[in-house]
Amino acid sequence: MIPNNINNRKKLKLPELFKEKYGFNKKGIELRYCDGEKGMGIFSNRKFNKGEKIMKIEPYVWSVAKHAIVCDECLKNKLDLEEGKTLKRCSNCKLVYYCSTDCQTKAWKIHKQECKILSTIPSTTDKKNINTKSTTMLLRLFIKRNLELINNNNNNNNNNNNNNNNNDNHITGQYEIIDGLLNHKDIRSDNNEYKSFSSGFCSLLGEDPQLKAPIVLEYLLKLEPNCITIPRCEASSIGLYPLMLFFNHSCKPNISIINNRKELLIITNKIIEKDEELFINYSPAICYRNERLDNLKQCFFFNCKCTLCLGEEKIKSKDLYITCNINNCGGRINQEIDININNNNNNNNNNNNNSNNNNNNNNSNEEILKCYKCLKVYKGQEKDEILKKKLIIKNLQNKLSTNTDQININQEFKSLLELYCKEIHPTDPLFYEIVNKTQLFYLGNNNKFISDNELSTIYHPRYQIMIKYHLLQVQNLEYEYCRQMLDYVNTLATTSYFKDALNILTDLMSNHLSQIDFYGFNRDELLSLLYNLQHEYKNNIKTSRKIIN
């Protein structure tokens, strides 16, 4: 099952493969060689408008976590099923589930070969401290490779195959793309652990570890940094999308990825000119700059040199998410080096002596606070007062780090939250943590400490502002905005805020969801939810009138 070798990356003709087999050129994009260290990238061969759909992609192989109760074929969980239907477990391995006979039939070609092996994986992989998902991914990768080899041998006269290539280890397609990936094994700090696992994996398949373990290790190190977590699926499902692997990273990408379970839809989030490279974001969309750079280095093994990072590096930008309240500006204040001081001084003092030039160099390193919106520069005492506001974030982080069951929503916490919302800019990543935590506060036992008026003035407006600003305006993720707001609609309905929930859902369905053709959402379910909210709202009004009378 395990291949005898891996194709030489230098011999692969990937640009031709992407063009001829996958029709990238017909989609308005093509694979090209890049300048510098990036190797290859995806470029546009025509102009794209904002919000334009480029392509849909399915994973080559995928996997879910051990013991996850989710359909192994379509990734539906029990909440996604129609009433009366359940997920049924494979009677043999008792590890994978299916939601229907149709899904089980689709998966059978691969599962019939992996079933016996999967049942022995837990006892093997737990000892090696390797994620079971990676084990399953490897197993399915090799099974699918063998199936493709059989198909190639049976159809070697077909024009779509690689001209009767007699090398039974050669497959022209997505598997070949995987062969061409870098493994970064020279800079991996955990190689010994993976080597141990690779030997165990060979033994599991009844193959000679001495011969095949290096091959397994090679693929394992290729898979880990190149698998994509599939959002909105239970138990952190992961997928390997070979056709996605040559989209390079930018912290300010020009395309976005929308998922409908396994399927990924690539859309533009800005106007893209012809011959412009297309970028996606490998790191979490909302995180502090140092966390973003550390994540890229640790998980993807490169120092980011995108335009955003180079610009931040040039001005020595530091994470600072404080709101500019001058004349109700509302812009974000950032901490940086004033690179203009040195230029201005040089223009005014061209005839100065060396000592003056040294002074100018010292001045050029002056740190300033600058509003990105109104361009006001804060210095001296004003700057010191602004920097003191960082304590607000620190104090709130300390509060949020406390176990949510033990936090009392007292006046101190509410005052701190109000101060945070007033002084800290909505793009601050901590807003996400606040939303998640306060949702537990307000829906848990502690909600008795909060009146309806306080609930609407503190929690709900900030939730909406944070989501709308961050996900819609900053990241241009219309889909993600809809998903988050639908979660919010359910939260409002749970707490009997039927009118608010009804207004938001009506706006979503009329505007935002219609813009993405309800992609990834069930229109009938949303119409049913809309009807139920209307019904609950009318009943709520009738009940209120009876109480008043």
Swiss-Prot record:
Residue intervals passing through the bilayer: none
Ranges of residues in domain SET: 27-283
Enzyme Commission no: 2.1.1.-
Keyword Zinc-finger: yes
SUPFAM superfamilies in the record: SET domain
Gene3D superfamilies from the UniProt entry: 1.10.220.160, 6.10.140.2220, SET domain (2.170.270.10)
InterPro entries listed in its UniProt record: H3K4_H4K5_MeTrfase, SET_dom, SET_dom_sf, Znf_MYND
Residues annotated to bind Zn(2+) 1: 71, 74, 99, 103
Annotated S-S bridges: none
MF GO annotations: methyltransferase activity; zinc ion binding
UniProt zinc finger (MYND-type) residues: 71-115
Gene Ontology biological process: methylation
GO cellular component: nucleus
SMART domains noted in UniProt: SET
Keyword Signal recorded: no
Residues reported to bind Zn(2+) 2: 90, 93, 111, 115
The entry's keywords: Coiled coil, Metal-binding, Methyltransferase, S-adenosyl-L-methionine, Transferase, Zinc, Zinc-finger
Family, similarity comment: Belongs to the class V-like SAM-binding methyltransferase superfamily.
Function: Probable methyltransferase.
The protein's name: SET and MYND domain-containing protein DDB_G0277331
Protein's organism: Dictyostelium discoideum (Social amoeba)
